[in-house]
Amino acid sequence: MGASFKFIHCADLHLGSTFTGLSSSEPELGERMRSSIFEALDAIVSKAKEEKVDFVIFSGDIFDSSNETPLTRSRFADALAEIKAPCFVCFGNHDYKRRWESTIPFPKNAFVFPEKVVRVKFVKNKKLAAIITGASFCNDLSFEDPTVTVTGSSEAFTIGVFHCNLENSGQDDDYAPTDLQSLLSKDVDYWALGHIHKREIVHETPYVVYPGNAQGRNHKESDEKGAYLVTVKEDVVTDMQFFRTGPILWKDLELDITGKEDIAEILSQLDGIEEGSMLRITLKGSGILDSMARLDPQGISELIESRTKCKVTKIDILTKPPIDLSAREETGDFLSAVINYGNRLETASREDLMEMICSTNTARSLRSRFEEFSDEELRQIVRDATYMIVEKMTEAAR
């Protein structure tokens, strides 16, 4: 009869993340984000104690780059001690340097995988329950497959613990690359992977799993972040329960003004948004609220923050006036001339756009500021100007 046990699989805590840009512009918010990283660790500890798990796996990037300070090292060591159950740790490309290993040692219940693949036996009730195999990064630019020498075992349920990049994962880098077919061929029952900041069960039976990072740090890491509670009965995974650890959500939201006549109708689209979330808002559609959106996007951001108790990190205005621009292009009147001229400017070169925008003495004095804008931002300025003129002319004709 096979063994039965429960464990937590987590990864990419990035303890010590500094949020430098946010901290310099909004110190209180920066401190809140820094604290959220440690709150995610606390949530893992609480879940481990609540569920009385048999062990916990940390699949790399526990610390953020060189930010394994005495404080972060101590906080993690204390967390391992509080868990009490065995903890299996591999280090990744961000935390391969371990500066305080001798002066701030981990507790005895922690096992840190070395740079070469090793196996560890997990014994429960005096019987072999699982074999856990893994390795840590030796530097931050490892481009070799760390799983090459891994072999599973028919002796017991086998878990592979690695910080690696699976093919077609969507990552820009190719650190520690491996491929799915290779993993599936190794007689390993559960691959506990880290590195990809996106939660994904890549394959079942055998399981190939990325839990994602424990707390989102930007809009690329949106929605709920957490870890997996895994139940194994008689050497078979019977339950995979995701649980949230990150206290702060990053959300991308699109709000449509089409058919809306009142700002309250726009705000109603935000019902149910969790208080304290970080929001990137895109206003889209066509309607009478276009003018307000373009004239005062900052005011709309502040209104959204007031109503939702969230932080708006960015607001993009992609709305249009409540007229059919395509149809008006063909009318041959002054309004169609404005629309057509605006369309031509949008396709102009950056140099031509700059010359047009900086054609007055006042604008020329601000040219260095305009030079900081991207090509798309310059085109958005032209687009906004076109839409504003169209709206003013349309209102005047009523």
Segments from the language model and where they lie:
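Domain-start "cap" segments at the beginnings of catalytic or binding domains
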Residues: 1-27, 225, 231-253
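Conserved beta-strand termini and adjacent loop/short-helix elements that scaffold enzyme active sites
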Residues: 10, 90, 113-115, 135, ...
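N-terminal active-site segment of His-dependent metallophosphoesterases
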Residues: 1-70, 375-383, 391, 396
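His/Asp/Glu-rich metal-coordinating catalytic cores
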Residues: 26, 51, 55, 64-231, ...
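Well-ordered alpha-helical segments embedded in enzymatic catalytic cores
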Residues: 40-44, 75, 265
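A generic secondary-structure signal
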Residues: 43-51, 79, 268-272
